[in-house]
C-alpha cells in the first residue's frame, strides 16, 4: 500500500511540474523584456573586421568567419550572422535579395513571435523580432532578428527563453563597421556569404540538416534571389 501511495505521489509531482507550452511562451516574453532593459555588463569585447560585439560572462565563442560566428549559450550552439545585403542596401540601393534564413523564417508559421524595440549600447533604438518555428519532435528553430544581425539556434522549446535572452543582450552590443563591409562586398557580383552561412548553420545541431533542406526548397521556389 505504501508503495502504491509513493507511486501516486510521484505521478502527481511529475504532472504538476510539467511545463505547459503556454507557460514557456510566457517565460520567453518575460526573458525578452528583461534582456531589453538589462544593464549591459559584458565579459569581453570581440572585434572582427566587419563588426564588434560583446559577450555576457556565460556565453562562449566556438568559431567564426567574416560574416558569421558560432556562440555557445546554455550548452547550445547559436549562429550569429551579419546580414551583408541589408548593410549594402541601406548605403547604396534597395535590393530584392533577402538573407536565406530571414526569408525562410518570414514564410513559415511560427509557434511564437514577438516584435518590439530596445536600445543598443549607443542608446539608439533597436527594433527586433523574436521567432520560434517547429522543426521536428521536441526541437525548434529559435531566431532573433535585428536590422543587420540574425541569431539562430536549434534546441528544445524549453531552452528558448534562456537562449533568446542571451541573443538579445548580445544584439544590443553589436556595432557594424559599414565602411569595411562596403569595401569587402560592394564590388562583388555574387555574395558568397549566404552559402557560407548555411555551411556554418549545418554545424548547429543534428536537426539543422532538416532545416537546411527546407530552406533550400524554399529558395528553389523563387522566394529568394541569389
Q: How should each PLM-predicted stretch be described?
A:
Residues 13-16:
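C-terminal motif of bacterial Sec signal peptides marking the signal peptidase cleavage site
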Residues 18-21:
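Bacterial signal peptide processing site
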Residues 25-47:
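Post-signal peptide N-terminal segment of mature Sec-exported envelope proteins
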Residues 63, 105-109, 174-178:
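Sec/Tat-exported extracytoplasmic proteins
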Residues 105-157, 161, 198-206, 210-217:
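Signature of long, low-cysteine stretches enriched in small and polar/charged residues
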Residues 151-226:
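Surface-exposed amphipathic alpha-helical segments
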Amino acid at each position: 500500500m505504501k508503495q502504491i501511495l509513493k507511486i501516486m505521489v510521484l505521478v502527481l509531482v511529475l504532472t504538476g511540474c510539467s511545463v505547459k507550452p503556454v507557460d514557456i511562451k510566457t517565460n520567453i516574453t518575460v526573458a525578452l523584456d528583461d534582456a531589453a532593459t538589462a544593464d549591459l555588463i559584458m565579459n569581453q569585447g570581440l572585434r572582427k573586421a566587419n563588426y564588434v560585439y560583446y559577450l555576457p560572462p556565460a556565453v562562449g565563442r566556438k568559431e567564426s568567419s567574416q560574416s558569421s560566428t558560432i556562440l555557445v549559450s546554455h550548452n547550445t550552439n547559436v549562429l550569429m550572422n551579419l546580414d551583408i545585403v541589408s548593410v549594402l542596401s541601406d548605403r547604396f540601393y534597395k535590393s530584392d535579395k533577402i538573407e536565406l534564413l530571414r526569408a525562410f523564417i518570414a514564410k513559415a508559421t511560427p509557434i511564437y513571435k514577438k516584435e518590439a524595440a530596445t536600445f543598443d549600447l549607443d542608446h539608439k533604438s533597436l527594433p527586433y523580432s523574436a521567432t520560434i518555428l517547429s522543426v521536428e519532435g521536441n526541437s525548434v528553430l529559435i531566431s532573433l532578428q535585428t536590422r543587420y544581425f540574425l541569431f539562430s539556434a536549434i534546441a528544445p522549446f524549453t531552452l528558448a527563453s534562456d537562449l533568446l535572452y542571451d541573443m538579445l543582450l548580445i544584439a544590443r552590443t553589436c556595432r557594424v563597421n559599414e565602411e569595411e563591409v562596403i569595401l569587402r562586398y560592394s564590388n562583388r557580383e555574387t555574395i558568397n556569404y549566404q552559402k557560407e552561412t548555411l555551411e556554418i548553420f549545418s554545424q548547429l545541431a543534428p536537426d539543422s540538416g532538416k532545416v537546411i533542406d527546407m530552406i533550400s526548397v524554399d529558395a528553389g521556389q523563387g522566394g529568394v534571389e541569389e
